[in-house]
Amino acid sequence: MLRKLLFFLTFFITGVTLSAQKNVKSVFVSGEEGHKSYRIPAIIALPNGHLLAFAEGRVNHAGDFGDVNIVLKISKDKGATWSKLQTVVDYDKLQAGNPAPVVDLTDPEYPKGRIFLFYNTGNNHEGEVRKGNGYREVWYKTSVDGGNTWSDEVNITTQVHRPYQPQINPAYNFKEDWRSYANTPGHAMQFESGKYKGRIFVAANHSEGNPKPQFTDYFAHGFYTDDHGKTFHLSQTVNIPGSNESTAAPLADDR
């Protein structure tokens, strides 16, 4: 009996695995569609069931810095097939990355929903940015037609970042001296109920001041909007040195 049970379980698990493998779709394939590598994916679903898959499209290599675009593919059949690749953000030969998309479903001006795509740009390698030899900025774009077209970019760096780079921009004059900066990885989120209903929240991380051993100059934080992107605010910094690659999910008690 035990042998029969083990055989059944093995057959069942193998069958499920093979069945799942048949449904696997490669959305982004390194070396195809103009990019050597794709990293940092994020996927969201629209109210109509369409899926939007974002990623960093790294043009020349798999490294974090360089000619990096934010690209998108859309599926209208629950992931069975995908559209051709669309470039949503192209920061010339520099880096645009860390896509954090979310659908705002609570704005009365957009009853069908409005997509926000938050992202970062950078002009140097992370190690150099940590030394103060470069800077990171925070932006967003929106779409009201399911990701087919996108708005102009909006720079929200002064609201959600604390850089000390007045030689770049007089407004980047914060004593906190945040340097490296990255959203997520993964999508942003919107609270669906409770006292924060409608709030859009983006998890992020940053480094503070000069580099420290074991990357203890890094800390997690978040930023949010309660008015559909008109203004943004910083959350408290998580006081855990070395915290990085932040993500967030709502809890049952509305936090």
Locations of regions flagged by a protein language model:
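Asp-box/BNR beta-propeller blade signature and adjacent active/binding-site loops
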Residues: 21-255
